[in-house]
Amino acid sequence: MSFSLRLSQDHDGRRLDRMLRSVWPELPLSAIMRAIRKGEVRLDSTRAREPGARVRGGQELWVPWEAPGERPAVPRRGAVPILWRGGCALVVNKPADLLVQPDVKDGDSVVTRVWSMLGTAEGGSPGFAPAAVHRLDRNTTGVLIVALRGDALRALEDAFRERLAGKRYLAIVVGRPSRELEEIDAPLLKDSEANVVRVSPEGKSARTRCRCLASDGGLSLVELELLTGRTHQARVHLAHVGCPILGDRKYGDFEANRLWRAAARRPLLHALELSFPDGLSPVLRELAGRSFRAPVPKDMRAIAVDRGWTLPADISCPGEDEDGDE
C-alpha cells in the first residue's frame, strides 16, 4: 500500500514531519517518524530520512499509506466555539476532553471539527487542510489558533518558534506560591515512552513566569506566561515549585485531587490569551497587534466564586454556555 502526490506551494518550506502530520492528521506521530527513519518516505524518488528536512512545492511525495481521508461531513459532537476568523487563520476556544489532532482515523478532535465546520470547499487553498499551529493537552481549555492556508501555517510556525506569540494561562493550584511574582527557570526532559516530563539538567531550556492573583492558603489562582513552549511545561513547572495544578493526576497532589475530585475532574489549566506583536510578516498582517482571549471555563469559575476570588472582567464570560461550552 502506498500513495503519491505532487506537493503544492502551500507545503513549500515546511518541515517534512509537520507537513506529513498536517496531510495525515489521523496517523500517530510515532508512525510518521518510524516511516521516515526506515526510509519509507520519498521525495522525488530519494529516501527522506530527516524529519526536519524542508520540502519544496512541486516535489513528488511517496508515502507507505493510503490517500488522505475525506473530512467528515458533519461534526461528531458539535462545533468548536470560534473567537475570531480571518483569511489566514481561525482562533477557537478549545473545550476540555478534546484532542487537538485525532489519535485514530476519523477520531474526534479540534481539527476534524474545524474541517466539518468550514466544509470541504472552504478553509484555504485546494489540497490544504486547516491545521493547528500549536498544541494544548486534551484537558486544557482555551485559545488555539488554526491556520487556513499553507503560507499562513509556515509564518505562524516561524512566529511561535521565534517566540513572537505571547501565551498567558490561568491555573488553580494547590498551596500558595512563595512569591507573588516569580520566574521558574527549570530545564525539562521528555520521556516519550512513559509520556511524562521531568525537570532535568539534561533537558531543554524552559521558563515560566508565574503571578499569584488570589489565594486562601489551600488553593491559589495564578496567571502564567509561558516564555518557552515545552510539553507539559506549565504542569511540571508548577509541581516543581510545590504548587501542582489542582486535578492533575499525572503531576499533581493525590490527596488534594481526592478532596476536590467532584469539582476538579481535569487539570484546572486554561489558555487565557494569545497575542501577537506589530511587525509580523505580510502574510499575517491580520494578526499584527491583536490579542485573543477565551472565557474562563465553568469549573474554574465555580471554584473562584466559592473561594471569594474576583476574576477580572476581561477574562470572565457569563454567556459562555451560549458559545458552545461543553
Predicted regions, residues:
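RNA pseudouridine synthases
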Residues: 1-194, 214-215, 287, 295-326
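Short coil/loop residues immediately preceding or within conserved phosphate-binding loops
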Residues: 2, 77, 127, 205-207, ...
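Short beta-strand segments
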Residues: 3, 182, 186, 206-208, ...
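Short coil-to-beta-strand transition motifs
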Residues: 37, 74-77, 200-208, 268-269, ...
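Short Gly/Pro-enriched turn/cap motifs at secondary-structure boundaries
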Residues: 134-135, 199-202, 263-266
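Beta-strand-rich ligand-recognition modules
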Residues: 207, 215-218, 225, 299
